[in-house]
């Protein structure tokens, strides 16, 4: 419905476009056949419509939308703290405008408490299967996702409890990435493993050793992925 409204289609016109959209050009179905083809095409059309509108009307927002969607599709399915996403560009107001547009277009949504931004599971899956369909795009998306994590600077967070909460947020993300099959491109990047080491450091100095234990599986995966002799793996 949001796609039809954004594109100015009557229902009959939207259904006609949906039925004639070439499936093979849109869905590569890398993650299993667990939803109807028509659903995949409809979700892909939603992305096409939204990004095309941004490209024509707000080109700077389109450039921001890509790293936003890359990050949301690869990080924790439970959502990403919205204030992290605002740091993806020097102008946080433009990021806010882009997030608002994506929400109005039903591409993303807020968590119940309003603290996180979430991409629906199927939306995320279709995005990965279409826009992240080759190695170059996967590497770019991985960089965007890891940048979102590594721009979290706990040293600059004001307040002891606030620092602890931000550390918990990072631990939640790292644990989710470790357990999510679709997030597996991230642990192969040394910068992600460096982020684990930094998070472990702050968990220790902020008096939360139990959080360090919670990342044992992530440390093991980093060692397996990079090799036990890699300096970042040892740092973890």
PLM segments and residue spans:
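Aliphatic-rich helical/repeat scaffold segments used for oligomerization and domain docking
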Residues: 1-187, 191-198, 203, 207-210, ...
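A detector of tandem-repeat and repeat-rich interaction/domain scaffolds
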Residues: 209-236
